């Protein structure tokens, strides 16, 4: 039996607020082996992230991976860590603050806008409880993954609904499934690339790199591959690129199984062997810069390309706090909030309800 968390006493006349919870993957608390061990244990224990027999995976994870990878991963994080902390957390916090300010200007009612992480801090559980304490009775969940995948957006929804099981008074919940072809998102991606090219010139080839997933997930019905392809195509069309000027590929392969291809590392190596003069890489699936962009692409990818004989290598930063991206998030949120009562009407209705309840003998 699920043990439900304590709830405050119900108060007649209380006015519920609307909350928006923006959720990203997560990050370790520090670039240390100890912090990485805790992070990787939680991350690699997610059944949607690693689809493997649980009993066998437990031995592999605890007997091998957690004794080897934390120290190696810590060294990678050390290379990208900032004075403010993890880039992913820093950018996600900034995005949240900017979106909150934008919505405050646009909306008739005050919104509570927070962010959480699937893995690490701040946790989904912590933020949902915090929003309930703040009086949110309607919460929109916005995964910061434009392309749906069971291992990303699916994990977000698992995390949210597992916490709802612990609540007696469950808030109204809406979720955003994906926005891989949202016009505002595509426009922000394209303008972000144009901004970079205006300062640094254009490449011979643009690599559009997405995080990979095992190929079997496509065969089992996951739409991720198709949504990545559509995002990449729409971005290339917005930039008016000929087919031979760009390549869509997938990075971050883990383990020995076949993943979605072509693999970014192999494409970079081949372009290097061809003595390509300049390659730029953009990662549309990562809306905030993180380990996979700043270390895997900007550092490792550059080394692969140049050591194979390539010329210039440029990594185009993620959307991060780009104004058009903040505007796009705001529009996506407003679209999904359609129909929820504004605060002024809620206050009027709540006051009438309170008076009726008191007349019937309610204490509060």
Swiss-Prot record:
Its EC number is 4.98.1.1. Its main location: cytoplasm. GO terms for molecular function: ferrochelatase activity; metal ion binding. Pathway: Porphyrin-containing compound metabolism; protoheme biosynthesis; protoheme from protoporphyrin-IX: step 1/1. One of its GO terms (cellular component) is cytoplasm. The keyword Phosphoprotein does not apply. Gene3D superfamilies: 3.40.50.1400. It catalyses: heme b + 2 H(+) = protoporphyrin IX + Fe(2+). It is found in: Cytoplasm. One of its GO terms (biological process) is heme biosynthetic process. InterPro entries: Ferrochelatase, Ferrochelatase_AS, Ferrochelatase_C, Ferrochelatase_N. Transmembrane segments: none annotated. It is an enzyme of class 4 (lyase). Fe cation binds at residues 211, 292. Pfam families: Ferrochelatase. Keywords: Cytoplasm, Heme biosynthesis, Iron, Lyase, Metal-binding, Porphyrin biosynthesis. The keyword Zinc does not apply. NCBIfam families: hemH. Belongs to the ferrochelatase family. Catalyzes the ferrous insertion into protoporphyrin IX. This is Ferrochelatase. It comes from Nitrosomonas europaea (strain ATCC 19718 / CIP 103999 / KCTC 2705 / NBRC 14298).
């Amino acid at each position: 039996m699920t043990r439900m968390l304590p709830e405050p006493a119900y108060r007649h006349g209380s006015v519920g607020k609307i909350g928006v919870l923006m959720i990203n993957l997560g990050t370790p608390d520090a670039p240390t082996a100890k912090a990485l061990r805790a992070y990787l244990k939680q991350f690699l224990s997610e059944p949607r992230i690693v689809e493997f027999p649980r009993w066998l995976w437990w031995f592999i994870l605890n007997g091998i991976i957690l004794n080897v990878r934390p120290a190696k991963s810590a060294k990678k994080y050390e290379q990208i860590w900032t004075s403010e902390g993890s880039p992913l957390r820093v950018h996600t916090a900034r995005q949240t603050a900017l979106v909150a300010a934008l919505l405050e200007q646009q909306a008739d009612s005050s919104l509570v806008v927070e962010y959480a992480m699937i893995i690490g801090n701040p946790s989904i559980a912590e933020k949902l409880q915090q929003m309930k304490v703040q009086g949110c009775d309607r919460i929109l969940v916005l995964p910061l993954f434009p392309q749906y995948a069971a291992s990303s957006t699916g994990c977000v929804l698992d995390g949210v609904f597992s916490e709802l099981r612990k609540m007696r008074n469950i808030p109204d919940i809406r979720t955003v499934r994906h926005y891989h072809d949202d016009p505002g998102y595509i426009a922000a991606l394209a303008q972000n690339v144009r901004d970079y090219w205006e300062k640094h010139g254009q490449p011979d080839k643009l690599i559009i790199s997405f995080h990979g997933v095992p190929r079997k997930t496509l065969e089992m019905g996951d739409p991720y591959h198709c949504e990545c392809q559509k995002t990449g195509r729409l971005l290339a069309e917005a930039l008016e690129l000929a087919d031979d000027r760009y390549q869509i590929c997938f990075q971050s392969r883990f383990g020995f199984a076949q993943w979605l291809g072509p693999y970014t590392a192999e494409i970079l190596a081949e372009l290097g062997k061809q003595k390509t003069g300049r390659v730029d890489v953009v990662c549309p699936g990562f809306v905030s810069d993180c380990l996979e962009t700043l270390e895997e692409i900007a550092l490792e990818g550059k080394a692969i390309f140049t050591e194979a004989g390539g010329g210039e290598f440029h990594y185009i930063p993620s959307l991060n706090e780009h104004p058009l991206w903040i505007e796009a998030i705001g529009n996506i949120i407003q679209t999904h909030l359609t129909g929820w009562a504004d605060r002024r009407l809620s206050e009027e209705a709540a006051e009438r309800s309170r008076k009726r309840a008191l007349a019937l003998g309610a204490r509060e």
